[in-house]
């Protein structure tokens, strides 16, 4: 197949032994200061005090054979000052650039999101980044409404950058209507925006992985969703000793409040406050509960119950006949069957901040307590009806990209993702640049990646370039070899070198 001896004379001067650089040098771009450009402009005086003086030529032309002469003055050149103002080279606060090294990490993360979703039989969907503001203010909760990036467009419509994906999914389900065959299993990876206080792993712009199941009323849906997240964690090296899931139920909280005679009209407000447990001092939680109308005695009783971490103990306090207790028992039983029981624990204080949750809720957390919620989700059986449709059983979760990257950093689990190009192709003569392009096309047509050297560069530069892009092979196009229909090929890892015919180049 590959012709040629391994000690070809033409290759000896070409494949010099060069040390690979340990790292690539960084470069920076500087913005120019204001600069002045002189352009012809007969409308302005050359000696105007508001402009720089500009020298211009005057020429005198005599008319031949006539009386008197005429002097032609060249129009003055008037300087126009281009103010190249210095701009902040950083992106807006809370947002990010993705240079190649960061983009490789993002692609790796998203690839894992998608592969896990497909393992569980989910199909990918996406939605507009810009949605009607009404989509989020109906049932999202007070916190989300305060964090919206919203404005009025030129058609006098109130719109918002999506702060999450679930309302858009609900809208799409309603749009498809009866053409959908339930149950639906969809996933999405999309950009979201929230104007919130930034902490580590929490930004104003982030990407979010969602998985949702529409049309299944049983708690088996929640159990499978948690299983998918556990599968993702295992794929990237996260263990049950690193991350856990706190599980509870909105129905359970309703039963607790009813047990202590708290009116159901206060439920939404109480949920928002309880969701702050662990984020605010307990005294602040008590003050907020009292401020919405919960009595001092009831506040103490509720907080005592919500501190319980045992489903059995809670069952003894409020009774075990409730629907919420039964669903949670089934969920923990399913966790054993799915094989992730060591990942989950009961925590009555988990309610999630979004107002549309109606049943089981869960939240992934960092066991070391360094980061806020890693992911979270639950059941939202009544969300579609708030948009004008019928009640449809549904549940799902959201998983942000920023916080998981911080967790991987803490655990030393960030992958090394270098640029990898299989071939680097270089012409040894500027006149052979077209031939090198032909070689690159042959390889690309066979599905191989190629970095084509587009300029006339010394071999030392080419070897350094090959090292930086982690190329496997260096392919050199020389004049005599090209006339024979061959190219020089060097395997960079071993130093093996050959002359190979074009039609045998694989």
Task: Describe these PLM feature segments.
Residues 255-258, 266:
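Short His/Asp/Glu-rich catalytic/ion-coordination signatures at enzyme active sites or charged loops
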Residues 244-255:
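Glycine-rich, mobile lid/loop segments that gate access to catalytic sites or pores
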Residues 1-43:
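N-terminal chloroplast transit peptides
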Residues 57, 68-81, 88:
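Alpha-helical segments
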Residues 264-274, 285-292:
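A charged helix-plus-loop insertion that forms the helical arch/lid used to bind
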Residues 79-84, 89, 93-94, 98, ...:
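Polyanion/phosphate-binding surface patch
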Residues 278:
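Active-site/ligand-binding surface loops and adjacent short beta/alpha elements
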Residues 2, 6-13, 47-71, 102-120, ...:
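Positively charged, Gly/Ser-enriched RNA/tRNA-binding surfaces
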């Amino acid at each position: 197949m590959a012709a040629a001896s391994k000690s070809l004379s033409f290759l000896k001067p070409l494949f010099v032994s060069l040390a690979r650089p340990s790292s690539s040098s960084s470069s920076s771009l500087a913005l120019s200061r204001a600069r002045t450009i002189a352009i012809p402009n007969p409308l302005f005086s050359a000696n105007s005090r508001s402009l720089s003086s500009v020298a211009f030529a005057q020429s005198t032309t005599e008319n031949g054979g006539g009386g008197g002469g005429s002097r032609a003055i060249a129009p003055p050149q008037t300087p126009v000052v281009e103010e190249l103002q210095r701009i902040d080279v950083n992106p807006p606060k809370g947002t990010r650039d993705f240079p190649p090294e960061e983009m490789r990490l993002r692609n790796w993360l998203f690839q894992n999101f998608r592969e896990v979703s497909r393992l569980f039989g989910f199909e990918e969907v996406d939605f507009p980044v810009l949605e009607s503001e009404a989509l989020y203010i109906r049932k999202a909760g007070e916190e989300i409404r305060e964090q919206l990036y919203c404005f009025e467009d030129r058609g006098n419509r109130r719109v918002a950058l999506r702060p999450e994906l679930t309302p858009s999914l609900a809208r799409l389900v309603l749009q498809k209507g009866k053409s959908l065959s339930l149950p639906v299993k969809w996933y999405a990876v999309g950009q979201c925006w929230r104007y919130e206080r930034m902490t580590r792993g929490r930004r104003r712009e982030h990407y979010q992985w969602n998985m949702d199941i529409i049309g299944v009323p049983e708690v088996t849906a929640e159990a499978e969703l948690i299983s998918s997240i556990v599968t993702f964690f295992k794929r990237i090296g996260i263990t049950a000793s690193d991350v856990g899931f706190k599980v509870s139920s909105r129905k359970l909280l309703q039963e607790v409040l009813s047990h202590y005679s708290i009116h159901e009209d206060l439920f939404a407000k109480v949920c928002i406050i309880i969701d702050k447990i662990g984020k605010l001092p307990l005294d602040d939680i008590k003050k907020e509960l009292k401020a919405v109308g919960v009595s001092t005695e009831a506040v103490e009783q509720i907080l005592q119950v919500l501190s319980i971490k045992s489903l059995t103990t809670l069952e003894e306090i409020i009774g075990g006949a409730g629907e919420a207790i039964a669903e949670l028992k089934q969920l923990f039983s399913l966790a054993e069957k799915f094989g992730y029981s060591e990942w989950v624990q009961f925590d009555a204080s988990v309610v999630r901040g979004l107002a549309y949750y109606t049943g089981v809720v869960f939240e992934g957390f960092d066991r070391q307590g360094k980061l806020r919620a890693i992911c979270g989700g639950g059941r939202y059986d009544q969300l579609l009806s708030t948009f004008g449709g019928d009640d449809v059983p549904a549940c799902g979760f959201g998983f942000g990209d920023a916080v998981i990257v911080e967790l991987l950093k803490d655990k030393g689990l960030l992958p090394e993702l270098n640029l990898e190009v299989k071939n680097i192709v270089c012409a040894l003569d500027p006149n052979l640049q077209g031939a090198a392009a032909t070689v690159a096309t042959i390889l690309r047509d066979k599905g191989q990646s190629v970095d084509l050297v587009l300029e006339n560069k010394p071999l030392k530069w080419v070897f350094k370039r090959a090292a930086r892009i982690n190329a496997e092979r260096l392919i050199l196009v020389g004049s005599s070899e090209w006339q024979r229909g061959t190219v020089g090929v060097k395997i960079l890892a071993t130093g093996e070198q050959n002359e190979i015919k074009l039609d045998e180049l694989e």
